[in-house]
Regions:
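Catalytic Walker B motif of ABC-type/P-loop ATPase nucleotide-binding domains
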Residues: 89-93
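Short coil-to-helix segment of the ABC ATPase nucleotide-binding domain corresponding to the Q-loop/switch region
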Residues: 26-33
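A short, proline-enriched helix->beta-strand linker immediately N-terminal to the Walker B motif
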Residues: 83-87
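Helical segment within the ABC ATPase nucleotide-binding domain
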Residues: 103-115
Length: 182
């Protein structure tokens, strides 16, 4: 596969699964720097520590995944994905196991650090799609088909309170078959 610039996708993508896929025998920092080590590169430990701090795990960098809660593990997986610093990022339900406040904070962080990149975000949360998406597609049917894109106004991350009262939110809910009022 190649992009519209003709260059191959290999080495240009990062992926975050809805499961954290952390290696249980590695510390938090070692999980975050895993990609560099697998490529034979020297890990940027300073950047890893900065990302761990930004996701609220700066004091847990030496801990193994088994000692972390589900939400902490998800934050660690997000830090690992952001550490890859790739132009194309695939994210499958990256915020699903987080409490509401942490979810909003990490959505803001992801929007900041992934600006100007191509991100394919899979989510079942209409609010999340509207906060973070430039173009939102709803898949439905069997076999699944993509509907026409919804393009919300403004730049991500959009304010959650404003999104919940927006016409775009009502439109997205209608496309999902959930009535018209948030």
């Amino acid at each position: 596969m190649s992009c519209d610039d003709g260059r191959p996708l290999a080495g240009r993508t990062a992926y975050m699964d809805q499961r954290d896929l952390l290696l249980p025998w590695l510390s938090g920092r070692d999980n975050v720097t895993l990609g560099a080590r697998l490529r034979g590169e020297t890990p940027d430990r300073k950047r890893a520590d900065e990302l761990l701090a930004r996701v609220g795990l700066g004091d847990r960098r030496d801990d193994r995944p088994a000692t972390l809660s589900g939400g902490m593990r998800q934050r660690l997986a997000l830090a690992r994905t952001l550490m890859e610093d790739r132009p194309i990022v695939l994210m499958d339900e990256p915020f699903s196991s987080l409490d509401v406040l942490t979810r909003l904070l990490l959505q803001d962080l992801a929007a900041e650090l992934l600006a100007e990149r191509t991100v394919l975000l899979v989510t079942h949360d209409p609010m999340e799609a509207l906060r973070l998406g430039h173009r939102i597609f709803v898949m439905s049917g069997s076999p699944a088909l993509l509907g026409a894109p919804l393009e919300p106004a403004g730049a991500p991350p959009r304010d959650a309170a404003q999104v919940s009262r927006s016409d775009a939110y009502r439109d997205l809910l209608a496309r999902l078959g959930v009535g018209g009022s948030p």
